[in-house]
C-alpha cells in the first residue's frame, strides 16, 4: 500500500484491477476542508488518461512491475516468440499483447517487456530503430525543393512517410513512438 501523499510522477498503482501510472499530481490544501491530491493517471494497458482525486493520506494499492529484457527470436503461427536474455526462457506473445509495436519487430531485436502478476502489460520498443526501405515511389530530380513526403514500406511491413529523396534499399531511422522518419542511417 502507498499513501496518496507519497505519489510521484511514474508511480504505478492499482485501482479496480487496472494498473495506472501517475503522470501528474498536485497536493492541494484549501483554506476550508481537508487536503487532497489531484492526479492525472495513465492506464499502462491501453494508454487512456483519467483525472482522479484522492484524499490526503488515502492508501492505495501500489503495483510493483517487473521489467525483463527479451530478444525477439522468431514468429510461429501468429505468435511472436521472445527469449529472456538471462534465463533463456521463451515467452510467446500475440500481436494484440504487443500492440502497434509489432509492425517494427525484427528477429534479434531486444525489447523490454513489463509484467504485472505474471501477465504482460506492455512491450517497450527502442525509441529509434534502423530499418531498410523495401518499397517506395522513385524520387524525381528536383523534388527536394518542395520538401514533400511519400509513403515507404519498410522491411518489417511498417509504412512511414519519408522525404522524396529516399529510395529503395536505403537504411533509415524511424521513431517507434509516432511512426516518423528521423533520418538516414550512416
Swiss-Prot record:
Q: Identify the CDD domains for this entry.
A: S1_EF-P_repeat_1 (cd04470), S1_EF-P_repeat_2 (cd05794)
Q: Where in the cell is it found?
A: Cytoplasm
Task: List, in alphabetical order, the Gene Ontology terms for molecular function in this entry.
Answer: translation elongation factor activity
The superkingdom of the source organism is Bacteria
Q: Does the keyword DNA-binding apply?
A: no
- A Gene Ontology biological process term: peptide biosynthetic process
Pathway of this protein? Answer: Protein biosynthesis; polypeptide chain elongation
Q: Which UniProt keywords apply?
A: Cytoplasm, Elongation factor, Protein biosynthesis
Pfam families hit by this protein: EFP (PF01132), EFP_N (PF08207), Elong-fact-P_C (PF09285)
GO CC: one term? cytoplasm
PANTHER family cross-referenced by the UniProt entry: ELONGATION FACTOR P, ELONGATION FACTOR P (EF-P) FAMILY PROTEIN
Q: Name the family the entry cites.
A: Belongs to the elongation factor P family.
Supply the NCBIfam families for this chain.
Answer: efp, PRK00529.1
Question: What is the purpose of this protein?
Answer: Involved in peptide bond synthesis. Stimulates efficient translation and peptide-bond synthesis on native or reconstituted 70S ribosomes in vitro. Probably functions indirectly by altering the affinity of the ribosome for aminoacyl-tRNA, thus increasing their reactivity as acceptors for peptidyl transferase.
Q: What is this protein called?
A: Elongation factor P
**What is the organism field in this record?**
Prochlorococcus marinus subsp. pastoris (strain CCMP1986 / NIES-2087 / MED4)
Query: Species lineage, top-down?
Result: Bacteria, Bacillati, Cyanobacteriota, Cyanophyceae, Synechococcales
- Report the gene name: efp
